[in-house]
C-alpha cells in the first residue's frame, strides 16, 4: 500500500511506525514541494546542526549555489562566543544579506526545511530581513 506524504506524517503521530530520519525526510519534502527558487527569487535554504547553522541561496533552475554563509565564518566566530546562539544566527543572516546584495539578489524565498520557524531559524530570517533581503 502506498500512502501520500501527508498521510504518512499523520501516521507518525498515531502509530509511531516511521523512523525519525524518514519522518524528517518526509517533512523536508513536504515543505520543499511548495517552494521553488527561480532566477528572480532564489531559495534561501537553511541547515541547522547542534553546534552551527548554515545557509545558502540557491537558484533551482540552474541548480547552483549563489551565496553561502555559516556560523563557522571568521567574522561571526569573532563576534559571538559560539555558533549555537540566536545572536550568531542573526549576525549570519545580516552577513548573508550583505553578500547577496553584492550579487544583486534582493528578493528570495525562505526554505526552512524540516525545522520550525523558531529560535535560531527565526533569528537568521530576522537578520536577513534587517540586512535588506525581502521574503
UniProtKB/Swiss-Prot annotation:
GO CC terms, sorted? chloroplast; ribonucleoprotein complex; ribosome
Top-level taxonomic group: Eukaryota
Sorted alphabetically, the keyword list is: Chloroplast, Plastid, Ribonucleoprotein, Ribosomal protein, RNA-binding, rRNA-binding
| InterPro entries registered for this protein in UniProt | Ribosomal_uL18_bac-type, Ribosomal_uL18_bac/euk
Listed GO biological process terms:
translation
Q: Which GO terms describe its molecular function?
A: 5S rRNA binding; structural constituent of ribosome
Q: Where in the cell is it found?
A: Plastid, Chloroplast
Subunit comment: Part of the 50S ribosomal subunit; contacts the 5S rRNA.
Database matches in PANTHER family:
39S RIBOSOMAL PROTEIN L18, MITOCHONDRIAL (PTHR12899), LARGE RIBOSOMAL SUBUNIT PROTEIN UL18M (PTHR12899:SF3)
What family does this chain come from, according to its entry? Belongs to the universal ribosomal protein uL18 family.
Outline what the protein does.
Binds 5S rRNA, forms part of the central protuberance of the 50S subunit.
Q: What is this protein called?
A: Large ribosomal subunit protein uL18c
Q: Which organism is it from?
A: Thalassiosira pseudonana (Marine diatom)
Gene name of the encoded protein: rpl18
Amino acid at each position: 500500500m502506498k500512502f501520500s506524504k501527508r498521510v504518512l506524517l499523520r501516521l507518525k503521530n498515531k502509530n509511531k511506525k516511521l523512523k525519525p530520519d524518514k519522518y524528517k525526510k518526509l517533512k523536508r519534502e513536504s515543505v520543499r514541494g511548495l517552494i521553488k527558487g527561480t532566477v528572480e527569487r532564489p531559495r534561501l535554504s537553511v541547515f541547522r546542526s547542534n553546534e552551527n547553522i548554515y545557509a545558502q541561496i540557491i537558484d533551482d533552475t540552474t541548480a547552483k549555489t549563489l551565496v553561502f554563509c555559516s556560523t563557522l565564518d571568521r567574522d561571526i566566530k569573532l563576534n559571538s562566543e559560539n555558533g549555537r546562539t540566536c545572536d550568531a544566527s542573526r549576525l549570519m543572516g545580516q552577513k548573508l544579506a550583505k553578500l547577496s546584495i553584492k550579487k544583486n539578489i534582493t528578493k528570495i524565498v525562505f526554505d526552512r526545511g524540516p525545522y520550525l520557524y523558531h529560535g535560531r531559524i527565526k533569528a537568521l530570517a530576522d537578520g536577513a530581513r534587517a540586512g535588506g533581503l525581502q521574503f
